[in-house]
Amino acid sequence: MKISAAASLTVILVAAALCTPVPASPYGSDTTPCCFAYLSLALPRAHVKEYFYTSSKCSNLAVVFVTRRNRQVCANPEKKWVQEYINYLEMS
């Protein structure tokens, strides 16, 4: 079975995005995490179970997605895919 180069590249990019998430870090004594970088690619929506916004004490506003494996991943709230995922999670 032959796989196209585009399909192979897509699989590699998705795997790389999942293997190198941008973790959320707690801010001082506050247990609410802050984000210092955003995930560059969209997560597969099926991997996301919930989300929350970072605290106003954080220097960067971010959405933190919690995956099915309980990993916290930072995302840019201005990105279209992030807004779509939030809407999807709110509706389900």
UniProtKB/Swiss-Prot annotation:
One of its GO terms (molecular function) is phospholipase activator activity. Pfam families: IL8. PROSITE patterns: SMALL_CYTOKINES_CC. One of its GO terms (cellular component) is cytoplasm. The keyword Secreted applies. SUPFAM superfamilies: Interleukin 8-like chemokines (SSF54117). Keywords: Chemotaxis, Cytokine, Disulfide bond, Inflammatory response, Secreted, Signal. Disulfide bonds join 34-58, 35-74. Residues 1-24 form the signal peptide. GO terms for biological process: antimicrobial humoral immune response mediated by antimicrobial peptide; calcium ion transport; cell-cell signaling; cellular response to alkyl hydroperoxide; cellular response to amino acid stimulus; cellular response to cytokine stimulus; cellular response to ethanol; cellular response to fibroblast growth factor stimulus. It is found in: Secreted. Belongs to the intercrine beta (chemokine CC) family. Chemoattractant for blood monocytes, memory T-helper cells and eosinophils. Causes the release of histamine from basophils and activates eosinophils. May activate several chemokine receptors including CCR1, CCR3, CCR4 and CCR5. May also be an agonist of the G protein-coupled receptor GPR75. Together with GPR75, may play a role in neuron survival through activation of a downstream signaling pathway involving the PI3, Akt and MAP kinases. By activating GPR75 may also play a role in insulin secretion by islet cells. This is C-C motif chemokine 5. It comes from Rattus norvegicus. The lineage of its organism: Eukaryota, Metazoa, Chordata, Craniata, Vertebrata.
